[in-house]
Amino acid sequence: MEEQDFTAGIFLIDKPVGITSFGVVSRVRRILGMKKVGHAGTLDPFATGLLVVCAGRPATKMISSFMDGEKEYIATLCLGVETETQDPEGAEIARKQVGFLHAETIETCLAGFKGTQMQVPPAYSALKHQGKPLYYYARKGIEVKKDAREITVHEIERLGEGDLEGDHPSLVIRVRCSKGSYIRTLGSDIGKVLGCGAHLTDLRRTKSGFFNVEDALTDVDMLAEDAHERFMKKVLSVESVGKLLQ
């Protein structure tokens, strides 16, 4: 696509660790020289992977449709350690030696999380309560009642095999789930069922709907001198993506 012809499109970004989803959007705005840019589904700063970014009004109008799609993640759990945010960014609140876990015990636990279920959103999340995100209240120590929401875990599997042993071994899982699913909370709940507690140390989104992170622009592309040219080579047109949504 010629640069002067660009008015709207969809970009797949592989978000690097340590930057917010809004930070990625800000970068894209600067690269494209456009203000009307948004993303379809927040990734926490510690997380990496696929962020669907829409530029131009025809594209941003499609954001809700993209957010409705299924998501796929690869998550690494640290067993035996719990944090207040269920991820590596929060303070440690509990620690327990894991010791030994049979492979069969792990598989049975994961199988129990497959299907439709009710999930209570984490206190440290962007969900709104009286106009403010839940993390606003959590940081002030204000407890807010969080209603459980229905989610569906379509697939969940362990990546790796064998028994786990040691003080705080890692468990790596792949999850394909519905919109609104919190993998941090899923990881914490898995730790509870295993009897040792857990928090996420790594989270990577690999798929969002029919989009795959393998096709995404990288941090190198965003920081390159010819970033605009690289983006134009990888832009997905509103028309082509619209056909996929039909």
From Swiss-Prot:
Entry-linked InterPro entries: PsdUridine_synth_cat_dom_sf (IPR020103), PsdUridine_synth_N (IPR002501), tRNA_psdUridine_synth_TruB (IPR014780), TruB_C (IPR032819)
Sorted UniProt keywords: Isomerase, tRNA processing
Active site, renumbered: 44
Pfam families: TruB_C_2, TruB_N
Highest taxon of the lineage: Bacteria
GO biological process: mRNA pseudouridine synthesis; tRNA pseudouridine synthesis
Known role: Responsible for synthesis of pseudouridine from uracil-55 in the psi GC loop of transfer RNAs.
Record's protein name: tRNA pseudouridine synthase B
Gene name in the database record: truB
